[in-house]
């Protein structure tokens, strides 16, 4: 339950903004942190051309055709790399890969061969690095690119799908920290 004080008549707990007032960047970021998200590393290229970044915004868009959406900061190296390559790979991390998430979320993350070595992956059929122990890896071809405020949204057609049934639990980010899914039993 929120500790905010309601500012308008009829406001409910946690809903304290006057109508028409947009949230600030920090407030919106904190609010979105309440939404648990899976954690993935998006990769482009391999070898000297490897670029990678951690994302918490991967969305299944369509089953037929298989489409996913990823959201990337518009000023990042990965946007240009995807534009050049015409595609990307999405690697959903396990709880044992939180170190990779932290590494590729930093501004001084490795790229080129250093990124490929740190990821410990192999190039897939698309030429993009796939993480060996990821819960799921998808090789995608860019279908569309959309501006989205300070981000770019890439809609990717999934050409190759790699699942690791024996992989550990997926890494989850919630309230600014990594967490795990609880076993329902």
Curated annotation (Swiss-Prot):
Catalytic activity: FMNH2 + NAD(+) = FMN + NADH + 2 H(+)
Ranges of Low complexity composition bias in the record: 1-13
Gene deletion effect: Mutant produces asukamycin in considerably lower yield than the wild type strain and accumulates major amounts of protoasukamycin.
EC number(s) reported in the record: 1.5.1.42
Biased composition (Basic and acidic residues): 14-24
Signal peptide residue numbers: none
Keyword vocabulary terms for this entry: Antibiotic biosynthesis, Flavoprotein, FMN, NAD, Oxidoreductase
Protein name: NADH-dependent FMN reductase AsuE2
Record organism: Streptomyces nodosus subsp. asukaensis
Source species taxonomy: Bacteria, Bacillati, Actinomycetota, Actinomycetes, Kitasatosporales
